[in-house]
């Protein structure tokens, strides 16, 4: 039997709009299994990003539970949630926000060293991952302003993977990539 990584139980999320409740997620029961590639598709405004935020702990549901194994993440406090996300979740968004005053390599190391204190191991993994997405050694010292949109996106993907997260949340992760790199990333 496959291991469940994320499970929801009667997940609901509502927003107030103009004095009315807008129900975006209603009693959602969902199981995501280790090793699976799960895609959430829908029309604009259908709740995809709302679901991503709830599953990742970036926003609390109105009702229901989000569980990683036996950890009910929507009951974690702010600091515990931050630690949990750093160790268990990777994030790739269409708009990548790299740290402007840091090189490509330092942008990746900064994320890796939030979880591990083994700088040598983190650096080795960072260099390996950067190579896998086509960011070569001569580009590691570049700053974000010197990168193309696709290069910045690939650095963002490496940052999401550096800590070997249990789950990677991606919201249009290949939007800035050419088709060859888009296929490689997926």
Enumerate the language-model features and the residues they cover.
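Helix-to-loop junction immediately C-terminal to a conserved catalytic motif
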Residues: 56
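Conserved ABC transporter NBD signature motif
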Residues: 64-72
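Conserved ABC ATPase "signature" region
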Residues: 71-72, 120-138
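Conserved ABC ATPase signature
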Residues: 143-147, 151-153
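Conserved catalytic motifs of ABC-family nucleotide-binding domains
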Residues: 164
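Catalytic Walker B motif of ABC-type/P-loop ATPase nucleotide-binding domains
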Residues: 168-171
């Amino acid at each position: 039997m496959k291991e469940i990584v994320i499970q929801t139980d009667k997940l609901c999320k509502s927003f107030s709009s103009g004095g009315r409740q807008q129900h975006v997620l209603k009693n959602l029961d969902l199981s995501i299994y280790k090793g699976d590639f799960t895609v959430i598709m829908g029309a604009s405004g259908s709740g995809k990003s709302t679901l991503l935020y709830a599953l990742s702990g970036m926003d609390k549901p109105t009702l229901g539970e989000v569980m990683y194994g036996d950890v009910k993440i929507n009951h974690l406090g702010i600091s515990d949630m931050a630690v949990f996300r750093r160790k268990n979740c990777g994030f790739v968004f269409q708009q990548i926000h790299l740290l402007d005053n840091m090189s490509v390599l330092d942008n990746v190391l900064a994320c890796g060293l939030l979880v591990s204190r083994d700088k040598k191991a983190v650096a080795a993994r960072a260099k390996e991952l950067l190579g896998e997405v086509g960011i070569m050694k001569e580009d590691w010292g570049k700053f974000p302003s010197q990168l193309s949109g696709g290069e910045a996106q690939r650095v963002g993907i490496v940052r999401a993977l550096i800590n070997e997260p249990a789950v990677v949340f991606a919201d249009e992760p290949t939007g800035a990539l050419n088709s060859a790199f888009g296929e490689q990333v997926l």
